[in-house]
From Swiss-Prot:
Biological process, per Gene Ontology: translation
Protein name according to UniProt: Large ribosomal subunit protein uL23
Functional note: One of the early assembly proteins it binds 23S rRNA. One of the proteins that surrounds the polypeptide exit tunnel on the outside of the ribosome. Forms the main docking site for trigger factor binding to the ribosome.
Gene Ontology molecular functions: rRNA binding; structural constituent of ribosome
Protein encoded by which gene: rplW
GO cellular-component term (any): ribonucleoprotein complex
Originating organism: Brucella abortus (strain 2308)
Length: 97
């Protein structure tokens, strides 16, 4: 386990067309800290939003290689968590914490 606080684990909600579609199936998508584990993500969502989490799936999106003024740079990697909530529960990510 790492020493991350609940607010440090969840970086931001992901609001895309795909995340809107999965929200119909009691799922919410968050950008999370790279070091965060699935149990830490589950504990943070349950503590911050007061909901019951049934599953957490994670994926790491690798950063793209970009060119700026002739120099090659690289964007940071982003860890994304798809959190499945218990039946009948929801999170309104548009209002914030």
């Amino acid at each position: 386990m790492t020493d991350l606080r609940h607010y440090d684990v969840i970086v931001s909600p992901v609001i895309t067309e795909k995340s809107t579609i999965v929200s119909e199936h009691n799922q919410v998508v968050f950008n999370v800290a790279r070091k965060a584990t699935k149990p830490e993500i589950k504990a943070a969502v349950e503590a911050l939003f007061g909901v019951k989490v049934t599953a957490v799936n994670t994926a790491v999106r690798k950063g793209k290689v970009k060119r700026f003024r002739g120099l090659v740079g690289r964007q940071s990697d982003v860890k994304k968590a798809i959190v499945t909530l218990a039946e009948g529960q929801s999170i309104d990510v548009s209002t914030g914490l």
